[in-house]
Regions:
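Hydrophobic-face positions in mid-chain alpha helices that act as interaction patches
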Residues: 1-63, 69, 76-140, 144-153, ...
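Residue-level signal for alpha-helical context at structural boundaries
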Residues: 94, 101, 168-169, 184-187
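Extracellular glycan-recognition regions
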Residues: 175
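Asp-centered catalytic/switch region of ABC-type ATPase nucleotide-binding domains
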Residues: 179
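Bilobed periplasmic-binding protein-like "clamshell/Venus-flytrap" ligand-binding domains
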Residues: 156-171
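Conserved small/polar residues in nucleotide/adenosyl-binding loops
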Residues: 195-202
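Short, intrinsically disordered, charge-balanced linker/junction segments flanking boundaries
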Residues: 129, 184-194
Length: 202
C-alpha cells in the first residue's frame, strides 16, 4: 500500500514510532513485543469494530473477476473501478478517482525497520486498468495482469479478513507475497491447516 501511496493506509493502520507505515513480514523473528509495537504499524481494530463478513467492495470485485474471465472487458473494468470506490467509501478515504487512474505507482520494496528482513517487491502491478485494444497487444498477458489488479485491490479491501485473503492467494497466486525467510514449505503456500502433534484425536 505504501508504494501505491494508498489513502486508505492511514484509515487502516497506525504509523510506527518514526511516523512510517511498516507491516511485519510473515515469518520473521521478532523477539521483543515492545520492539514490535514501536517499529511496526498496528491495525486500527478495536473490540468495538464490527466483524466483517463480506463488504460491498468484495461483491464488486467478485463480479469484476467473473466478467474478466467469462463476461465482457468493459464490465470487468467498470466493476473493478466501482469496487475500489466502494472500498474507499467504506474506509472513509478520499481521492478514489485519482487512485484508480494512476498508471505509474507500484508495490514498494519492503524495508524492515530492524534491518534483517528487507526485500524487493515481487510485483510491478500498477493500479489503472490495462486496455488490450491496441493492435498487437498480448491479450492473454494483459488479462492476467488485470486479474492481478483485481485480486491485489480485493486483498486490500477485505482487510482484516486474513483467512479470506489467504484463500484468495491460494486460489489465484495474487497478490504476490514475499516468501517467509525460513521457508519450510518449499516455496509453496499451505493449502490446509495441519493439526499439531499429537492431534486432537489422540
Amino acid at each position: 500500500m505504501t508504494g501505491y501511496e494508498d489513502p486508505r493506509l492511514e484509515k487502516m493502520f497506525l504509523p510506527n514510532d518514526k511516523g512510517d507505515y511498516v507491516g511485519i513480514r510473515i515469518g520473521i523473528d521478532v523477539t521483543s513485543k515492545s520492539q514490535a509495537q514501536a517499529k511496526y504499524s498496528n491495525m486500527i481494530v478495536t473490540s468495538s469494530t464490527p466483524y466483517l463478513w463480506i463488504n460491498a467492495a468484495e461483491v464488486a470485485f467478485l463480479k469484476a473477476e467473473y466478467e474478466l474471465r467469462w463476461g465482457t472487458k468493459d464490465a470487468a473494468k467498470a466493476l473493478y473501478e466501482q469496487a475500489i470506490r466502494l472500498s474507499f467509501e467504506d474506509k472513509g478515504a478520499k481521492d478514489a478517482d485519482a487512485y484508480i487512474a494512476d498508471k505509474t505507482r507500484k508495490p514498494a520494496a519492503y524495508n524492515d525497520p530492524l534491518g534483517n528482513y528487507s526485500a524487493t517487491a515481487l510485483s510491478s502491478i500498477t493500479i489503472a486498468w490495462e486496455d488490450d485494444s491496441a493492435e498487437g497487444a498480448d491479450k492473454a498477458a494483459i488479462k492476467e495482469r488485470n486479474l492481478e489488479r483485481i485480486i491485489t485491490q480485493k486483498w486490500i479491501a477485505i482487510f482484516p479478513l486474513g483467512v479470506e485473503a489467504w484463500s484468495e492467494h491460494r486460489r489465484t497466486g495474487y497478490p504476490k507475497l514475499l516468501p517467509v525467510p525460513t521457508d519450510k514449505s518449499g516455496g509453496t503456500v499451505d493449502v490446509c491447516l495441519l493439526y499439531t502433534s499429537p492431534s486432537p484425536r489422540d
